[in-house]
């Protein structure tokens, strides 16, 4: 199925290829992937603790400086890893989590 899709794209006209690229969720960089996140947005973040956590996306958000974020995840990472980076940088306004035990900043 996937190979048929890519075959059609490879031999499609330019307009069709542009249309596919515009709807694709594959980004060339982490910064590009998070550029539409605005101050005050709500983010659902996967992973379990720091395992499977989207580290590159979190670093890109930290670098771009979005603030007043509401974040929903199972925890807030640790001080300098995972969501702990955003918490320490005061970019998270509200954190919804089921476990608070590993991050001293979050426990306060």
Locations of the language-model features?
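Conserved alpha/beta enzyme-core scaffold
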Residues: 2-108
């Amino acid at each position: 199925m996937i190979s048929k899709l890519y075959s059609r794209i490879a031999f499609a006209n330019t307009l069709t290829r542009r249309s596919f690229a515009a709807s694709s969720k594959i980004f060339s960089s982490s910064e590009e992937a998070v550029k539409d996140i605005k101050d005050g947005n709500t983010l659902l973040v996967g992973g379990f603790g720091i395992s499977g956590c989207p580290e590159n996306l979190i670093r890109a958000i930290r670098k771009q400086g979005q603030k007043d974020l509401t974040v929903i995840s199972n925890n807030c990472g640790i001080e300098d890893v995972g969501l702990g980076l955003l918490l320490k940088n005061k970019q998270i306004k509200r954190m919804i989590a089921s476990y608070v035990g590993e991050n001293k900043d979050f426990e306060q």
